[in-house]
Amino acid sequence: MSEKLSAKQYAEQLLYKPEYAADKQPDVKEKAAAFAEGYKNFLDHAKTEREAAATSEQMLLAAGYKPFEPKKTYAPGEKIYFIQEHKAVVAATIGQKPFEEGFRLVIAHIDSPRLDLRPNPLYESDHLSYFKTHYYGGIRKYQWGTMPLAIHGVFTRADGSSMSFSVGEDENDPVFCITDRLPHLGAEQNDRKLSDGIKAEELNVLIGSDAVEEEDVKEAVKLNTLILLHEKYGITERDFTRAEIEVVPAHKARDVGFDRSMVGGYGHDDRVDAYPALVAEIETKDPMHTTVCVLTDKEEIGSDGVTGMQSMYVFHFLQLLCRAAGQDDIIAFQNSVCLSADVTAAYDPSWAGAFEPKNGTYAGRGVAFFKYTGSRGKSSASDANAELVGDITRLLDANNVAWQIGELGRLDLGGGGTIAKYVANRGIPVLDIGVPVLSMHSPFEVIHKTDLYMAYRTFSLFCQAEQ
């Protein structure tokens, strides 16, 4: 007859005690800090989805990846990639097993909430020149006032040539800003709802104040600004109508905290998952299953468009691989597994009322899983099977990877979604995973280095797994 355990012994055996990964594994701090240095560099060079795609392509080419050829048959170990319309990346390492035994996909997104210039953005008012903007994604508009801003983009000229540019990132560059009311005259604004603290039509970027010297010239400040742009970039006002220009925070990624345990910066959502997913794919050697890393676009506005996951570009790539090898893509999809790599909210003690503590995810406890996302009654969610959650978490447990699982926040306050459902719609089982973020969708988000590192380890193990 077995000896009866004490309550304390039962507690040790049965209860789940969340732990902070760096506290439990001291060596993790050093490894996480080293990995974060590469990530910060990536973040600084990838302020827009175009820049993220271009930076990723440079990394892939340096690692020996070759451009994808649709009708070519590839051998195990070969590394291929393609760029979708300058804004999305697909990279793959051919596995030892046939495609019909399934792909292993990790999908993150590289677009972030921001301000876009309107088609006719340039105007003058009271001897000041401005750009009109149209916000992209779920920003809190009041957060974008009175901070240094940079302008990144591409012009397509009338002759068909194009030119990329960036102003505001170099120390010697000028910066730009959105002005706000002074508190002395803020009584009316103070009565606004928070969401209207700065309204969409007030998100106007200040870009100049000097006028041309000649008299009797209409809109002399606007003209002077345009002359400066023409002298440097060779563009006219009409060229704005065929441009893609984005306004982003001008600051660089920085360590946060006296202990430097965190990283603050713009664009963690979702480049904090995109970077480790890409590095894991690059480092993958001779996998059993073909691994596919996708850095997609347009997630922040519903994944629509030719570069979003509601498009077929990823699935066409997989189908073309199968067809060139004489294999059935439907069978391949049925045997595939996907990790939808997107950030989640980190529990914030300063805003505790937004969270349900027992089911929150915490900065420093490791990579976070979500069996489902959606809002309210799981609306628009992809709900992963328990078996898939078990398979992935067992892999991590066997390799001492810190992970946690939870929900976005309190029910009925709102919600959120990912690209998971668009992959699931193709018959591919998918599980949401990502790094918890403080101040998500703000111009300066914060993540814990340990969680970033654990995401990298998770993606690496997933790519190299035999099953």
Can you say where each PLM-predicted feature lies in the sequence?
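N-terminal hydrophobic/helix-forming segments and targeting peptides
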Residues: 1-467
